[in-house]
Amino acid sequence: MKILSVNVGLPREVLSGKDIVTTGIFKEPIEGPVKLRKLNLDGDKQADLTVHGGEDKAVYAYPKEHYDYWQLELPNTALPWGMFGENLTTEGLNEDAINIGDSFRMGSAEVVATQPRLPCYKLGIKFGRMDIVRRFLTSGRPGIYFKVLLEGEVEAGESIELISKDENNITVKDIVRLYVKDNKDVNLCNVR
């Protein structure tokens, strides 16, 4: 597993229909090491802290493998790294294999997987098509939010190392499945 790109962006105002909306979803790849702090990366900020950011959503990672899927789904759409609003574009970090609670070393930082991304309407603003929100959610390709356990630096090209595997075996994808369609799955709902 490795980091392919580190992407940051500050909130900006954009036009959505007739409304002006403030969003932090626009991320750009940057070169060199970047400090990963308890609430975000240096040079990055979330716009609406009532639903975005905080310690449990300090950094958002999205796998390159999903870009391959979306390129087939949206063949006429440019998909540069950061297009999905992710801070880290990764390789090999798959929601099927990552448990909520798994911890990792990324560069000199340590993080723990906390939850999948459940997108808001601002993803639709970024893509210029509101159907992407539903398509993203039902695709089962949510990406992963991480909490920062130990601040450090991250950089494109660095490896992502598993430190410990959570014993509950609830994957990031399991959570999305419960949210989207299988909310009566007794085996998942009864985990303590």
Predicted regions and their residues:
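Short loop/turn positions at the edges of beta-strands in beta-sheet-rich folds
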Residues: 92-94, 140, 150
